[in-house]
């Protein structure tokens, strides 16, 4: 089974490596075109006795304030909140979201509520980092979970103290349009790289002619709006984002020792190195032996004699030689000949890197 898995990995790595071109819109985005995080404090009502306990004070204060704003005078000492839970509401405001646009919201309990499933989120203002209200949220909470219990047993599915309000947020304040009336745009790469940024600038200049784009650093490409697209920024962005480039990446090997996962980039190369692999199994068994004197002996005594059994089993090791400039597919094939497991391969790759024979960055997660 292990050899089959490694053979599959080798087959995938030794397939013809084609220069895969991707759209610019998939590897970069314009400066300012991003989501903005919103947050708010609210109440979930209508719970079936699974809300906050009386020991949690802020739900009582919040509920009293809500009732007073509605003209209902209450004594805070008489309020119980078993059917109410104080929650934090979060959401992401998409770029170019217009007034009246619906967005999803996340609801998370703040107190000691057992479950907010089936409750209703009361109208909650959602603020941005600048303190302004950009949306309001309200609606039924969906948790896809439950929590039931008795005196001797309980049952729970998923996480009943956090849920979603699908389309529960309503945008009230729009973000400014960062693309309108701008003669210069900055394109930010999701993964900064000198080569990729240069290729993007070259592709844009070939398509629109002239010095439209220039890579200012590995993470940004500055673009001047062509004269033919004056007043038509959206059309220019649409035409530019459809262009395809071949992104470049630094050679990297990612190892996860907890799960045995290995991810190896296509650009990884190995210098000439010899690899030996062997398995050593040590088996130790203690079997104490009791020695008793002969019957009716007056001088003898019962003693315990230790007896240790040791077995050493060393698997058949081997020596594999990896040639100069070998690709990662060739490395896997050489190591496969030694019969290594994925976890053994992690140790071997780390040893190759320590020997200075791997021209790649090794990241352990």
Swiss-Prot record:
GO terms for molecular function: structural molecule activity. Keywords: Bacterial flagellum, Periplasm, Signal. Assembles around the rod to form the L-ring and probably protects the motor/basal body from shearing forces during rotation. InterPro entries: Flag_FlgI. It comes from Geobacter metallireducens (strain ATCC 53774 / DSM 7210 / GS-15). Belongs to the FlgI family. GO terms for biological process: bacterial-type flagellum-dependent cell motility. The keyword Signal applies. This is Flagellar P-ring protein. The basal body constitutes a major portion of the flagellar organelle and consists of four rings (L,P,S, and M) mounted on a central rod. GO terms for cellular component: bacterial-type flagellum basal body, distal rod, P ring; outer membrane-bounded periplasmic space.
């Amino acid at each position: 089974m292990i050899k089959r898995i490694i053979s599959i990995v080798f087959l995938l790595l030794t397939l013809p490596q084609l220069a895969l071109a991707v759209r610019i819109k998939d590897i970069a985005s314009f400066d300012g075109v991003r989501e903005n995080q919103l947050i708010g404090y609210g109440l979930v009502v209508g719970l079936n006795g699974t809300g906050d306990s009386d020991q949690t004070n802020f739900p009582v204060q919040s509920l009293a304030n809500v009732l007073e704003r509605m003209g209902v005078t209450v004594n805070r000492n008489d309020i119980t909140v078993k059917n109410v839970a104080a929650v934090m509401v979060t959401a992401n405001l998409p770029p170019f979201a217009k007034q009246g646009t619906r967005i999803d919201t996340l609801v998370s309990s703040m107190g000691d509520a057992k479950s907010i499933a089936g409750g209703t989120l009361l109208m909650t203002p959602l603020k941005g980092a600048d303190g302004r209200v950009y949306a309001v949220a309200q609606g039924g909470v969906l948790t896809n979970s439950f929590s039931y219990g008795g005196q001797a047993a309980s049952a729970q599915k998923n996480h009943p103290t956090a849920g979603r309000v699908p389309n529960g947020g309503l945008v009230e304040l729009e973000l400014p349009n960062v693309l309108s009336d701008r003669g210069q745009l900055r394109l930010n790469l999701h993964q900064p790289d000198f080569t990729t940024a240069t290729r993007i600038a070259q592709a844009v200049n070939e398509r629109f002619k002239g010095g439209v784009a220039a890579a200012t650093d590995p993470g940004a490409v500055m673009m001047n709006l062509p004269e033919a697209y004056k007043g038509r920024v959206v059309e220019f962005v649409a035409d530019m984002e459809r262009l395809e480039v071949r992104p470049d990446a630094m050679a990297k090997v990612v190892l996860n020792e907890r799960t045995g996962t290995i991810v190896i980039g296509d650009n990884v190369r190995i210098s000439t190195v010899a690899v030996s692999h062997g398995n050593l199994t040590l088996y130790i068994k203690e079997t104490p032996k009791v020695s008793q004197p002969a019957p009716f002996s007056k001088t003898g005594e019962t003693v315990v004699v230790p007896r240790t059994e040791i077995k050493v089993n060393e698997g058949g090791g081997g020596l594999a030689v990896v040639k100069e400039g070998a690709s990662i597919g060739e490395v896997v094939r050489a190591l496969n000949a030694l019969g290594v497991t994925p976890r053994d391969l992690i140790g071997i790759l780390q040893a190759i890197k320590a020997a200075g024979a791997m021209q790649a960055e090794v990241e352990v997660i």
